[in-house]
Regions:
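N-terminal beta-rich core of secreted/periplasmic extracellular enzymes
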Residues: 1-98
Length: 98
């Protein structure tokens, strides 16, 4: 990768997408946040913050799941988050809080 290509991965295309690098066959990547689940904003909502987001599961807070000491349950939560990301075309989830 060139220095410019590396830098483009740090800054992104917009709030929610990393630029593609066609020369290397790297597709555009969508990222979303959400400490308690997936928070993907509607395409029309171009402002960061509370707005029109697609409905998604709101999982218990990180401190609550940590207090359960139930690794299997937390693993299943990760699987559910992965399924929601796949359904919404999200490649990277910036969460959950751990």
């Amino acid at each position: 990768m060139t220095l410019e290509e590396k830098a483009s991965l740090c800054s992104g295309k917009d709030f929610w997408h990393l630029k593609s690098i066609e020369r290397l066959g790297l597709p555009e990547i969508m990222v979303c946040d959400g400490p308690h689940g997936l928070r993907k904003q509607n395409a029309e909502n171009k402002k960061v913050g509370i707005g029109n987001s697609y409905p998604a599961t709101c999982f218990p807070t990180a401190v609550t799941t940590a207090c359960s000491w139930d690794r299997e349950l937390i693993y299943k939560m990760g699987q559910a988050l992965a399924e929601e990301c796949l359904q919404h075309g999200v490649s990277v989830l910036l969460g959950p809080g751990v």
